Amino acid sequence: MKLRAVVLGLATLCTSTATFAGMVSTSSNLEFLAIDGQKASKSLGKAKTFTVDDTQSHQVVVRLNEIVGSGSNQSLFESNPVIVTFQGNAEDLVISAPAIRNLDSGDKFNQMPNITVKTKSGNAISAKVDVLKQEGLFPSGNVLNDLAEYNASGAVASVSKFTATTSANSMVAAPAGNAKANKGKVVVQGENVAEQQLQYWFQQADKETQTRFLNWAKSHK
């Protein structure tokens, strides 16, 4: 009996102190830009999943990408970065946004992002959602800097514990204008904004993507 009591006691203790991890994923039209104060890796961007601790608060920055319009009027809509703060869960979670069919819907989403967090079984998880305001020629390169400032501001979806982490991992912002800019190995110098953006994103891409882009550019001369 004593042995049984000891076993039951250990089992109860383990159950009460155990930490379970769940997976977080997104709907197909969302991509992770940052997770818990750190830039989302390229591999994570492809997998669109990461593991969370159910006892902790988590913060992600996501962006909605959607092809809108039809036929020859199709275009790519990219939303402003959106901050989503939520509590981890032992069950897998899905962060999702509705489909955007036209630019008007995209503008409405930018003004008031409709993003939900639910468990795989469909239960809604409380989440704080806010737009990460950005400025400059290459705003996506400033996500971590802007997020650090946001977390330090005490705004609705801010998490103060990520302020230091975000600041330490923040990227150097690419300057606007027609000047040369070094961002790692990235250098841009163009006659207009469009040319600078093309140079910037071309140098950000991997070799395979660069090759595909060059082939595409040749076919559209």
UniProtKB/Swiss-Prot annotation:
The keyword Iron-sulfur does not apply. This is UPF0319 protein CGSHiGG_02140. Residues 1-21 form the signal peptide. The lineage of its organism: Bacteria, Pseudomonadati, Pseudomonadota, Gammaproteobacteria, Pasteurellales. InterPro entries: UPF0319. It comes from Haemophilus influenzae (strain PittGG). Keywords: Signal. It comes from the Bacteria. NCBIfam families: PRK01904.1. Belongs to the UPF0319 family.
